[in-house]
Amino acid sequence: MQKQHQRQHKVELVANLKSQFDSAKALLICDYKGLSVRKLEALRNKARIQGIKVQVIKNTLAHIAMKEAGCADLDLKETNVFLWGDDQIALSKLVFDFQKEHKDHFVLKAGLFDKESVSVAHVEAVSKLPSKEELMGMLLSVWTAPARYFVTGLDNLRKAKEEN
């Protein structure tokens, strides 16, 4: 009875992970050997704010869920923490910022963007891109620049006329 209950729990866990991996735009796998529980919880809290999921999953269960979700096949070994979400840039930034703080205990091992395997170097390059909010700010600045210059020009013209 106990084994059957455990098996059912694993089947449900794999089904849940499959649906989440299926809808995720990005999935990163990191080694967290030696990282304290408190630091892992801090990572989870930062991730939760950004809508990113963080979970330690047995490699065999994660492998099954990823395969069922149609993700690229990855060789999962040792201790892994899985992070996934819809924003590739935010997820990449979160992982690399956390990795900078905890170099010896937290290392990115593999990544999937849109279910395709990507290199650690690719994820690092993505982490350096501006976020969606930063891009919108840049775009807004570009859009408002002509009006700003026009108003500045009119103000300078007014000042020149007042001096004469």
From Swiss-Prot:
Q: Which InterPro entries match?
A: Ribosomal_uL10, Ribosomal_uL10-like_sf, Ribosomal_uL10_bac, Ribosomal_uL10_bac_type, Ribosomal_uL10_CS_bac
Which superkingdom? Bacteria
The record's annotation in Gene3D superfamilies points to: 3.30.70.1730
Annotated Gene Ontology cellular component terms: large ribosomal subunit
Q: Which GO terms describe its molecular function?
A: large ribosomal subunit rRNA binding; structural constituent of ribosome
Q: Which GO terms of type biological process are on file? A: translation
Q: Does the keyword Lyase apply?
A: no
Q: Which CDD domains match?
A: Ribosomal_L10
Keywords, alphabetical: Ribonucleoprotein, Ribosomal protein, RNA-binding, rRNA-binding
Give the family this protein belongs to, as stated in its UniProt record: Belongs to the universal ribosomal protein uL10 family.
- UniProt subunit comment: Part of the ribosomal stalk of the 50S ribosomal subunit. The N-terminus interacts with L11 and the large rRNA to form the base of the stalk. The C-terminus forms an elongated spine to which L12 dimers bind in a sequential fashion forming a multimeric L10(L12)X complex.
The record ties this protein, via PANTHER family, to:
39S RIBOSOMAL PROTEIN L10, MITOCHONDRIAL (PTHR11560)
Q: What does this protein do?
A: Forms part of the ribosomal stalk, playing a central role in the interaction of the ribosome with GTP-bound translation factors.
Name-wise, this protein is Large ribosomal subunit protein uL10
Gene name tied to this protein = rplJ
